[in-house]
Amino acid sequence: MAVSMRELNRATLARQMLLRREAVPAADAVRRVVAVQAQEPASPYIALWNRLDGFDPAGLDAAFASAAVVKATSLRITLHAVHAADYADFHQAMQPSLRGSRLLDKRFVPSGLTAAQAEALIGDLLEFASSPRSNAEMEAWLAGRVSGEAKAAWWALRTFSPVRHAPSGGPWTFTPRPLYVAAGIAPSPGDPALSDAALRVLARRYLEGFGPASAADLARFAL
């Protein structure tokens, strides 16, 4: 079936709730649009204000506080807000990119860790992060466990470990000084088969939020 550019445009806008504002709870809206850019604290709030009829920021505050919506490093190796029901699959799907972006980067070298040694730290790291921790606290914890620079180790680990941003105050739930907490899922092994299965879930979710779309569209969205 042929789809005109106008039809494709309108289909995408409708799926993204951008043709008209809708009366939908904040967490449900995040799930419908698949993921919301969250590099800046205000960004998810602006995104939902543009989509929701009568948007109340307190609803998104509550969703972040309860972890119904998770802010974490994910798509395109940047911070996104995603629904809790999607987080585990998205995290696993992105593992090859998240790991490669850090473990193969020269900025990881000063940590003195191998990839396997970094992997071995994740379980204890998540236990330490069972309550919110600052960058300084995480680096201090790592300082006694790595032979090199703790800052380099944490720079890598916070990207591919299942940690989320914990609310840290301010008018948009988060401040420029992030707090990290374990996301409540098991560490994602660097298993290509598991990542491929999760990528299929991500592809279906992408089509729900943006389709019709091509493989190249999905790649631009995720990578």
Show which residues each predicted segment covers.
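Long, low-complexity intrinsically disordered regions
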Residues: M1-L223
